Swiss-Prot record:
Belongs to the PCNA family. Homotrimer. Interacts with ORC1 (via PIP-box motif); the interaction occurs during DNA replication in trophozoites. Interacts with ORC5; the interaction occurs during the trophozoite stage but not at the late schizont stage. Interacts with FEN1. It comes from Plasmodium falciparum (isolate 3D7). It holds the Pfam family PCNA_C. Disulfide bonds: none annotated. It comes from the Eukaryota. One of its GO terms (biological process) is regulation of DNA replication. This is Proliferating cell nuclear antigen 1. Transmembrane segments: none annotated. GO terms for molecular function: DNA binding; DNA polymerase processivity factor activity.
Amino acid sequence: MLEAKLNNASILKKLFECIKDLVNDANVDADESGLKLQALDGNHVSLVSLHLLDSGFSHYRCDRERVLGVNIASLNKVFKLCGANESVVISSKDDEDNLNFVFENNKEDKVTNFSLKLMSIELDSLNIPDCEEGFDAEVELSSKELTNIFRNLSEFSDTVFIEIDSNCIKFTTKGIVGDAEVALKPRDSTSEDDIGVTIKSKKKIKQSFAIKYLNLFSKSNILADVVVLGLSDSRPIEFKYEIKDTSPDSDTLKIGFVKFFLAPKMDDDMDNKD
């Protein structure tokens, strides 16, 4: 038996909204540590890694390991049934081929049920980029600020250069109409609205990426106020968003995390590199 209750169902509603344009079908691995999803996008260019912790649910039970094949677009539709201030109970019996959802509002006068048919999905095992030794550079900043940077720069080019040293992170595009650059220096947080910028750099890094995917990753600003970027030479960039429940009546704070990975572009002209 698998059974998991989340008091704030809107968190999962936002989560599936964030990844639906990247992932089509995926296997959700359920075990005693929680729910995990790892999947490539449809073009096999980017990778999504999600872990919802068992401790992030107000109730979690998983009697044995399960693999649940789901269509993300269908999950997104299911969670559109969820209204504001509603909880969700997700369950599946061991002998069932369905994943059941029960949404209930906090007044307990509205209950919505849905039974989603599970899929049999044959997917190759994925090798999540391992960086136990740490990244060459890490930057922590406001997720909304990063979203705005990518959205604005995508008006000028389909490629963005990210350059980091201990004193600055630069986002640069080179387009037909001209060149654009946004530079952020380290700064302390001054308020809840100004998270600040933290830069840790072992060496100077400069890489280029398809801005289309960075725009899709940065949609996750609705899940977390802070994003951590991890970069190393010849390795995919990592976007990490910690998923938290900040509602006043939350039983827990940290729900889990979602990570996005994208390999740097390798075919840019040498004139664009140092």
